[in-house]
Structure formats: structure tokens, C-alpha cells
């Protein structure tokens, strides 16, 4: 057996090294390897959205006006989902649907799949950017881990949910009022507010807002060293070595207020990371469940009693009737291709009516 000792030498002008040196060079805007995914995808996603909201109608897919050109404003313009008949087609510009015709591609809803897919990969690229920069400056990757939560929500709502339904048609369109319509749809057809995963998501987001407000106020309240500047932002150097607020004072204050308090800054900040990230991940899992048409809580005994006794009604039974109303009124407008017609007598009315 021969053992070779020595060092493997590469060519001085190795292409990978040249690329690595240029991509990771210290500049005003870091590019990095992740930038090869992030910047093109973000550019195309934003460009597609601005193009769609400015010029493209939704007449052929939803029977709606959805662009500034047709009279919409920022709140009502949208890039709409493709028609239900197109199912889960990727709607490639060169595909069998548009056959290279850009105008026809826009009319069919091709911009929605374009924006959704480039947007998803752009978000993933941004998370990889945080990983790459953290590794470069020897930080731990918790920023990237935290950013995985909004990515999970985006992917579950815009991609996984419609994949579980009959087509991209049932995903949210990219617009403010369009998202509101989608929320009403989720409530009416899935009773989303009574879903335990939605409850965990709300607890995570609102709990994080509360923690953030308490934390910021506590740090401001316990500042003990004043600088010469006119305000907090001018008073201190951002690279100062010493703390200028008192963790001990904050601990004593909240111990008196609540009876318990964080005594360790690592645990405090981990908790502030854990609450919103876990909440968003739970809500994303809930949306995956809705893609499979899993149901929320059902209190059937209350529904049966409400049906038998005109004087018995709970907030739950009222909400169930409201959901039926949303479905009956919304389906005919939201799915015009189904030609749904509901006579007046089948539209739900509560016991009070």
C-alpha cells in the first residue's frame, strides 16, 4: 500500500474561487451565493405583480376588474389566480395554454403562477442569505430559522392549500381586497376561526406583539447612563461595549408586577423568538390541514338542540349560520363558472329572524 503525503493544489484561477471571491466580497449590498436565487426571483416576482396590478384584467378568470387601467386603486387591484378549469397547470408562457402569446398568457392568469413561484423561491433565497451572512461573520443561524415561519405561511397558503383543492383558482389572489375575500372564504368554507391551529397562530402573533412592546418599554425604562446626544439614537455609539440598561432593575420590577420575571437574557430573547415562530408554524400546519379539508371543532350537540329548540342559540350556532350565509352568498359570486343559483328560501336565517 502506498501512502501519498502532500497537499492537493488547485489551479490558481479556479472558476469557483473566482466566483466565490466576487459574490462574497465586502460591498454596500452583499450578494453572496444566495443572491443568485434571491435577486432574480425577487425582481421577477415584484415586476410581475406591478405589471399585473397595472395592466392585466381578471375578466377571463374571475369576471372582475383588477388593474389600475380598469379603474382599481391600490387596495382593490390584484394579480388574480387562474380559472378553475386550468386546475394545477404551471401556466408556462411557452406551454400548451398560452403557446408563447404573452397577452393570452396574462389573460389566462399566468402572472399569478409566475409571481407565486418566483415569490416563494425569493423568500427562500432571503432565508439562505441570512444563513450565508451568519456563517460568514460567525453568528448562529436563528435569524434564518425565525424567517422560516413567514415562508411556511406563504407556502402553505399560496401553494399547498390550492394544491389540495381543485386548482390554483382557490388560492388567494395577490392584492389587499383579494386577501380579505380569501379570509372570508376560509371562514365560510372551513370555519377557520374555530380551528385550533388558527388559535395558536393568533396567540403567537399577538403574544409576540405584547412581548415586543413590553421588552422595548422595559429597556427604555431601565436606562441608567445618559449620553450627550439630543436623543437615545444620537447618544450612544452602536458598537459600545457596555450595557446602558439594568437587567437587575427590570427583573425586580416585573417580579413585583407579575410575581415572576425573566432572570436570564438568553431565555428572555429565546422566548421572544419562540412565541411568534411557533405560532406561525402552527397556523401553516393548520392551512395544510385545510388543503385536505380537515374540519375545525364541531359542537354537534349544540347544533341539534338549536335546530329543535327555537329559543336555544349560542354564539357557536350563530357563527355556523353565518358561515352558511357566506357559502350561499359567496359561492355564486366567487365561482361564476359553476352557474350556481340559490333561491331565497334556502338562504340561511337565524332563529332571531
From Swiss-Prot:
Its main location: plastid. Pheophytin a binds at residues 130, 143. It is found in: Plastid, Chloroplast thylakoid membrane. Photosystem II (PSII) is a light-driven water:plastoquinone oxidoreductase that uses light energy to abstract electrons from H(2)O, generating O(2) and a proton gradient subsequently used for ATP formation. It consists of a core antenna complex that captures photons, and an electron transfer chain that converts photonic excitation into a charge separation. The D1/D2 (PsbA/PsbD) reaction center heterodimer binds P680, the primary electron donor of PSII as well as several subsequent electron acceptors. D2 is needed for assembly of a stable PSII complex. Belongs to the reaction center PufL/M/PsbA/D family. GO terms for cellular component: chloroplast thylakoid membrane; photosystem II. PSII is composed of 1 copy each of membrane proteins PsbA, PsbB, PsbC, PsbD, PsbE, PsbF, PsbH, PsbI, PsbJ, PsbK, PsbL, PsbM, PsbT, PsbX, PsbY, PsbZ, Psb30/Ycf12, at least 3 peripheral proteins of the oxygen-evolving complex and a large number of cofactors. It forms dimeric complexes. This is Photosystem II D2 protein. It comes from Illicium oligandrum. Its EC number is 1.10.3.9. It comes from the Eukaryota. The keyword Transmembrane applies.
Amino acid at each position: 500500500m502506498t501512502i501519498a503525503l502532500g497537499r492537493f493544489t488547485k489551479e490558481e484561477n479556479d472558476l469557483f474561487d473566482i466566483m466565490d471571491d466576487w459574490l462574497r466580497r465586502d460591498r454596500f449590498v452583499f450578494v453572496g451565493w444566495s443572491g443568485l436565487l434571491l435577486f432574480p426571483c425577487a425582481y421577477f416576482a415584484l415586476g410581475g405583480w406591478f405589471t399585473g396590478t397595472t395592466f392585466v384584467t381578471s375578466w377571463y378568470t374571475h369576471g372582475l376588474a383588477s388593474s389600475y387601467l380598469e379603474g382599481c386603486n391600490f387596495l382593490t387591484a390584484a394579480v388574480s389566480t387562474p380559472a378553475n378549469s386550468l386546475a394545477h397547470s404551471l401556466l408556462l408562457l411557452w406551454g400548451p395554454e398560452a403557446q408563447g402569446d404573452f397577452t393570452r398568457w396574462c389573460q389566462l392568469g399566468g402572472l399569478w403562477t409566475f409571481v407565486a413561484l418566483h415569490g416563494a423561491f425569493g423568500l427562500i433565497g432571503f432565508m439562505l442569505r441570512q444563513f450565508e451572512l451568519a456563517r460568514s461573520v460567525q453568528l448562529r443561524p436563528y435569524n434564518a430559522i425565525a424567517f422560516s415561519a413567514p415562508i411556511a405561511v406563504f407556502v402553505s397558503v399560496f401553494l399547498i392549500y390550492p394544491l389540495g383543492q381543485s386548482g390554483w383558482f382557490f388560492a388567494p389572489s395577490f392584492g389587499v381586497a383579494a386577501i380579505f375575500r380569501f379570509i372570508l372564504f376560509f371562514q365560510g368554507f372551513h370555519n377557520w376561526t374555530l380551528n385550533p391551529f388558527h388559535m395558536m397562530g393568533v396567540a403567537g402573533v399577538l403574544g409576540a406583539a405584547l412581548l415586543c412592546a413590553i421588552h422595548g418599554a422595559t429597556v427604555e425604562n431601565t436606562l441608567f447612563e445618559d449620553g450627550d446626544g439630543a436623543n437615545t439614537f444620537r447618544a450612544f455609539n452602536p458598537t459600545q461595549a457596555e450595557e446602558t440598561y439594568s437587567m437587575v432593575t427590570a427583573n425586580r420590577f416585573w417580579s413585583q408586577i407579575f410575581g415572576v420575571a425573566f432572570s436570564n437574557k438568553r431565555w428572555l430573547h429565546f422566548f421572544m423568538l419562540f412565541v411568534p415562530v411557533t405560532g406561525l408554524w402552527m397556523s401553516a400546519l393548520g392551512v395544510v390541514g385545510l388543503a385536505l379539508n380537515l374540519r375545525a371543532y364541531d359542537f354537534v350537540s349544540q347544533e341539534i338542540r338549536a335546530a329543535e329548540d327555537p329559543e336555544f342559540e349560542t354564539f357557536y350556532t350563530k357563527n355556523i349560520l353565518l358561515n352558511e350565509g357566506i357559502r350561499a352568498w359567496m359561492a355564486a359570486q366567487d365561482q361564476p363558472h359553476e352557474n350556481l343559483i340559490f333561491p331565497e328560501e334556502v338562504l340561511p336565517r337565524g332563529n332571531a329572524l
